[in-house]
Regions:
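N-acyltransferase acceptor-side catalytic subdomain
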Residues: 1-303
Length: 303
């Protein structure tokens, strides 16, 4: 939920946008509970206290990112403005293996995926899928190198460092999947995902970061998508959240999913302007999602 345009508008009009209050999981665009409460009454009280804190503080705004739909409705009832976004999620429809999944796609999409995987295989690339204690420090060092390279490729600065990845490797090893691509006996690319298993079975995998130090055609799709899809099928996970941006995910079996955020702006004029903008944007989001569903890659009747 990017608000750079809002911050820019504030700056151009000589109004400070920072500091602002943010309720979110850092660096993690994943929908989940943002108001931690024992019951609905406590949740309402806590949400109201959060809004009151914003109103009484010297901040420009309050932003709650990726709450559950129920929480979004709660913030809406309190007068906050709702914003919608689109992510792409893959759903495991009880697939037994990757070809089982491919069989649900239209012929052209199925053929394209097989061609992409073949290019990587023919280039001599092999893969290691590592979880838990199997992830060594050398693997973290290489992944961190790939992570930094991705940011350099996009002329940006990385937020996380090697020590962060080492730390999560120690504190939550059973929730991490690290894919290492190798060619000629050396690593050339990697992808990191986080997953959680539900108590009753199933679970969700969240794609996070990917990077490469050598170019191989279609390596991104194989490392960051197809290897993770195979893991989901083998592990019995229900969902693979591929994140935002990239209609290319649609052609690979990821369907659009609407996400939510809630916003309060202290400045009356800006609040009114953003409210009108969000009304128009929401209409565009709904039309966009409908169009994406019309072009989904599955055989008709197989969604």
């Amino acid at each position: 939920m990017f608000d750079w345009a809002w911050a820019d508008a504030y700056q151009r009009n000589g109004v400070p946008y920072y500091p602002k209050l943010l309720c979110a999981v850092p660096f993690t665009p994943v929908q989940g509970t943002r108001v931690l409460a024992a019951d609905d009454d406590a949740r309402r009280r806590l949400a109201a206290t959060l809004l009151a804190l914003a109103e009484q503080s010297d901040v420009s705004s309050l932003h709650v990112l990726f709450p559950t739909e129920t929480e979004a409705q709660l913030f809406d009832s309190m007068g906050m403005m709702l914003r919608q976004g689109v992510q792409f999620h893959w759903i495991n429809d009880g697939y037994r293996h990757f070809d089982d999944f491919l069989g649900t796609l239209e012929q052209k999409k199925r053929k394209n995926i097989r061609a992409e995987r073949r290019k990587v295989h023919d280039a001599g690339v092999t893969f290691r899928r590592l979880t838990g204690d199997a992830i060594r420090d050398a693997d973290w060092r290489f992944f961190s190198r790939c992570y930094r390279q991705t940011y350099r490729d996009h002329y940006s600065s990385p937020y996380l460092n090697l020590e962060f990845f080492r730390t999560i490797g120690q504190t939550m090893p059973d929730n991490l999947l690290l894919v290492i691509a190798e060619a000629d006996g050396k690593p050339i690319a990697s992808a990191l995902a986080v997953y959680q298993r539900d108590p009753g079975g199933g679970g969700t995998l969240y794609g996070r970061y990917w990077g490469a130090v050598e170019h191989v055609p279609c390596l991104h799709f194989e490392t960051a998508y197809y290897q993770l899809l195979e893991f989901c099928i083998e592990a019995g996970l229900d969902t693979f959240e591929g994140g935002a941006q990239g209609e290319h995910k649609l052609a690979r079996g990821f369907l659009p999913t609407v996400t939510h955020s809630a916003h309060w702006l202290a400045h009356p004029a800006f609040s009114d302007a953003v409210s009108r903008f969000l009304e128009r944007e929401t209409n565009h989001i709904h039309a966009y999602v409908d169009e994406l569903h019309d072009h989904n890659p599955f055989k008709r009747g197989a969604e």
